[in-house]
A protein has these predicted regions:
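N-terminal secretory signal peptides and thylakoid transit peptides that target proteins
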Residues: 1-18
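Conserved N-terminal/central alpha/beta ligand/cofactor-binding core
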Residues: 13, 58, 64-65, 70-160, ...
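C-terminal segment of classical bacterial N-terminal signal peptides
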Residues: 21-26
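A short, basic/flexible loop-to-alpha-helix module at the beginning of a structural domain
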Residues: 28-39
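Beta1/beta-strand and adjacent pyrophosphate-binding region of the FAD-binding site
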Residues: 38-49
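N-terminal Rossmann-fold NAD(P) dinucleotide-binding loop
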Residues: 52
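Flavin (FAD/FMN)-binding glycine-rich loop and adjacent Rossmann-like elements that form
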Residues: 155, 171, 175-187, 191-461
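A short, glycine/Asx- and small/polar-enriched loop/turn
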Residues: 164-170
Length: 461
């Protein structure tokens, strides 16, 4: 089935959102004056994902004293704790122009020096490279520990903020093994993914209705996939998700690949969690339990269907400690990026990042893709377990075809914030634009850009 998606229809396509403001007054006012101070810095970076590391390292290399706060025991966020082993292309959609460099490229080169990354076709709309997620932890450790002016706080979360006037922060309050402590600073970067610092400091945030928030995925690594392929040449792991195989799941698509450096192991992203707002503790808890239930169902279904010699079994060897989270809170910023901005390649005077990843929206029982060249694809699970693919166009062939898009600094700047800037998936953008902007290679650039903005502001002070 082919459908013509006109430009008129495209421009009218949008989604509702819910304004949430900051957190309640008690959370936002968890003040620094009543807790001991753990240090005074030029910059506090909340969130030690790859995005947060890019922000901290960029600032430290330019002479700033930085505190880096991460709730896990290691850096990397989705690239490590969620076992997501993919970064998308650093090139334009035609593969002719490198549009992303900086620390993202440096990280890839460090992984490549040890054979811990595998590059794909630079024009591939899905995958730029696969990397070993454990090796990624070590590379990010190296980047941070090479900078003597970065102080790291692992197993720590931002629980509040202190302001001396509206829009001006003086400290972030964290909770870690040593208790509740304040980190004082001149500037702050929120790289938490969920806009935790911005919300706790009382800045306005918003989020979509729960039913429209993108679906989340728990990833896992499995052993003994090779023997199944050897015996069953037509084996496709996604087939297990179909109703007739008894896994009891509601979708029939996933994504898998050999683990870099250990091709006898396979990464798999085949779970699907909908109607979950990960900024709500109860939602996140139930999502984790449900995702792990789905993993067990997948393992059991494979072992029922496929027998292997020598008593071998399809075996779960590693389970992500975090959900692969796609979306939660967004900040209310000075500018909201739209799908038109992305897919028509709008240029911004305050451009701080470029990207070429397609619009990719995980919704309900399916996925929708929109490409810069005007193509649209939809994939949806049917009641009978089959996947229905439809292709069409969201714009006419006569429209210009950009090969990349730009991200403006204003979309990272919360309204009324004097010394807070954000980086990552809390960017202010429409649901459709977010489908493209949310991927890690884009977020990493936001981290670097946020740090560079802080450096410029401090130099001008």
């Amino acid at each position: 089935m082919t459908t013509d998606f006109t430009r008129k229809g495209f421009l009218g396509f949008g989604g509702a959102f819910l304004a949430t403001g900051g957190l309640d007054a008690g959370a936002a006012a968890a003040g620094a004056e009543s807790v001991p101070c753990a240090g005074t810095f030029d910059l506090v970076v909340a969130g030690g994902s790859a995005t947060g590391v890019c922000a901290a390292v960029t600032a430290a290399r330019k002479g700033l004293k930085v505190a880096l706060v991460e709730y896990n025991a290691f850096f990397g966020g989705m690239a490590t704790s969620a076992l997501v082993p993919v970064w998308h292309s650093l090139y334009s959609t035609d593969g002719k122009t490198q549009i992303i460099g900086g620390l993202t490229e440096e990280i890839e080169k460090r992984l490549a020096a040890r054979g811990e990354i595998e590059f794909k076709d630079r024009t591939d709309p899905s995958v730029g490279c696969y990397f070993n997620t454990a090796a990624m932890q070590l590379v990010l450790d190296e980047l941070v520990t090479e900078q003597p002016t970065i102080t790291t706080f692992f197993k720590a979360q931002v629980v509040g903020a202190e302001k001396d006037r509206e829009g001006h922060l003086t400290a972030a309050v964290i909770e870690d093994k040593s208790g509740r402590r304040a980190l004082k600073a001149k500037w702050f970067v929120d790289a938490t993914g969920d806009a935790d610092l911005a919300a706790r400091a009382g800045f306005e945030t918003w989020k979509l209705p729960k039913s429209e928030i993108q679906a989340h995925t728990l990833c896992a690594i499995f052993a003994n996939v090779g023997p199944i392929y050897d015996k069953y040449k037509a084996f496709v792991l996604n087939e297990i998700l179909k109703p007739e195989f008894g896994a009891g799941l509601r979708h029939v698509f996933g994504w898998w690949a050999p683990v870099v450096g250990a091709h006898d192991l396979y990464f798999y992203a085949g779970t699907r969690i909908t109607d979950c707002d990960p900024s709500v503790a109860e939602d996140l808890t139930q999502a984790l339990l449900e995702a792990r239930r789905q993993i067990r169902k997948i393992v059991d279904a494979v072992n029922r269907k496929y027998s292997m010699p020598d008593g071998k079994r399809f075996t779960l060897v590693s389970l992500a400690s975090d959900l692969g989270l796609r979306e939660s809170r967004h900040i209310k910023a000075k500018y909201r990026v739209t799908e038109k901005d992305v897919l028509y390649g709008r240029h911004f005077e305050d451009c701080i990042a470029k990207g070429s990843y397609r619009v990719d929206i995980h919704e309900g029982r399916g996925i929708k893709f929109r490409y810069l060249d005007g193509k649209e694809q939809k994939m949806e699970a049917q009641a009978d377990g089959k996947v229905a693919w439809t292709e069409g166009r969201w714009r006419t062939d006569s429209d210009p075809r950009p090969t990349w898009y730009e991200i403006p600094l204003r979309a990272l700047q919360p309204e009324k914030a004097e010394n807070l800037i954000c980086a990552g998936r809390m960017i202010d953008c429409t649901r459709e634009a977010f489908g493209a902007l949310r991927v890690m290679v884009n977020c990493n650039q936001m981290g670097e850009a946020a740090a560079n903005h802080v450096v410029r502001q401090l130099q001008c002070a």
